[in-house]
Amino acid sequence: EARILSMLGALFLLIGLLPAGAAGPAQEFATGTLPPETLFLMLIASAIRAGVYPFHLWLLPRTRSKLNLSERLLDHMAPVLCGLWLFGWTFQLGGAALTLAPLVLTLLALTLLATAIAAWTAEDQLHYVTFVLIGSAGVAVLAGGLAHNPGPSGMFWATTAFALGGGLWLVGDQVWRAWGWQLPVSFGALALAGVPFTPGFLAQPSLSRLLSGGIVYWPVFLLYVIAQGILIAALLRSWSTPEQAGAQDLPQSYTARLMFASLALGLPLAISGILPHFTETLAGLSNTVAP
């Protein structure tokens, strides 16, 4: 399934360039102009690569085995990040105008609601973790489509929350199981939930456009609030009592890598939430914070 969906995504990109003519592949991501047909197919290809519901099948675990941290980080988060940035470029080329249609936003909110329900009702940790990350990516797509500055800049904070917050949430869960130390998993979960002083909070002004855009967007906002509430409720399961492995049962090199990963993810996550302008300058982007 993963290979089939990956091939379909690439095929949509190739087909999407046909209406753009001979100059289609030469379009610049920042200043190019593409026809609606190309933008639509690029959005589909982005959704497949980002694993947004219902194009998430290639991300689902094949077994009910225990969580493999490396597999979730490399096989899930890395390709999804590529898909989110492809979404950003597509939005900048004009795809955001297609996304702002009330029907499209309603579909995005409904898919986010379905993902949140799946995360809440997941019976095992592996599916639970997978659907929480899929839901977080869905929030990033919705925020990017509504951003005041469509493009990679508009998706920067939601994508940062997914990458750093989601990564710390995964690593922190293993830290908690090893030592009973809750701070890393808690910080990661709070970043995914979008609380103040985290990059996820800086993406909230984009989502608030659903309230200021007119009454036609209010049902979409209601769907989003319900979906986000369920997703946050699912994140609260992060504080349920884990199966303690015990640090003495784990190799010393593994525990050292967990500690290093927690610091490597937690430090930039804290800096990005507290010093957003410094972070956007460091990333080489501008106008990422909503006015």
Locate each region found by the language model.
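Predominantly late transmembrane helices and immediately cytosolic-facing juxtamembrane segments
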Residues: 21, 159-175, 182, 218-262, ...
